[in-house]
Swiss-Prot record:
PROSITE patterns: PNP_MTAP_2. Changing T176S: In haplotype NPB. One of its GO terms (cellular component) is cytosol. GO terms for molecular function: guanosine phosphorylase activity; purine-nucleoside phosphorylase activity. This is Purine nucleoside phosphorylase. Homotrimer. It comes from Mus musculus (Mouse). The lineage of its organism: Eukaryota, Metazoa, Chordata, Craniata, Vertebrata. Belongs to the PNP/MTAP phosphorylase family. A purine D-ribonucleoside binds at Y88, E201, M219, N243, H257. Pathway: Purine metabolism; purine nucleoside salvage.
Amino acid sequence: MENEFTYEDYETTAKWLLQHTEYRPQVAVICGSGLGGLTAHLKEAQIFDYNEIPNFPQSTVQGHAGRLVFGLLNGRCCVMMQGRFHMYEGYSLSKVTFPVRVFHLLGVETLVVTNAAGGLNPNFEVGDIMLIRDHINLPGFCGQNPLRGPNDERFGVRFPAMSDAYDRDMRQKAFTAWKQMGEQRKLQEGTYVMLAGPNFETVAESRLLKMLGADAVGMSTVPEVIVARHCGLRVFGFSLITNKVVMDYENLEKANHMEVLDAGKAAAQTLERFVSILMESIPLPDRGS
């Protein structure tokens, strides 16, 4: 499906936000399932429900509050999405990624994406954090791409490169920050693969995804990253490994959404510290003299 939004629609939303807040965010953070508590660390927070904001879709998933929160975190002006949008909710990819282009028009230069994911890599344990080094856009293999349709050069080029989608420098800084934290949880690095959902993957699908080189699997993030890179944003992402994907027919365990939320709660304090420390490594924009 082609983009149902015009450039003016994005502008309308951005202008509305700029008129209703004095914040001019440098960083946007998209909080995944069970990770919305990150917003509690924003100082002098200003909150907008999605239903207040022109053109904004509504979040329908448990663990996604559906709020846009502006504030300060470690000296960085931020906007955080407390709840994202998914294909499985019935949204087109242009709606799933709508906020990213709005963030670009607000002046955001760095996008931080977080998600809950199932571990495909046998070396991953529940509770590990995986820095996203690369992704596999499986819906894209079937023509589902957020950039499909006429290109608007005001956002970016027709054929954007994705070989460097996730910022290497920020990943290196993340490893340094993790060592400083002295955490017992493991910080991993790997490839994230996106499925459309909402059902969890079959054993055969899980085995195929592992053969493709994926380390973790989820139902989000990739469309947002594609649009962010199209807009020229720096991207940093990580996955919280909330379950080990079942790849054996003799294994009677079944993935479920509650374990995703529970893992998010258990890791909340660690992730909040992690993101807060990382903010210090994000370069401030050059506003000129």
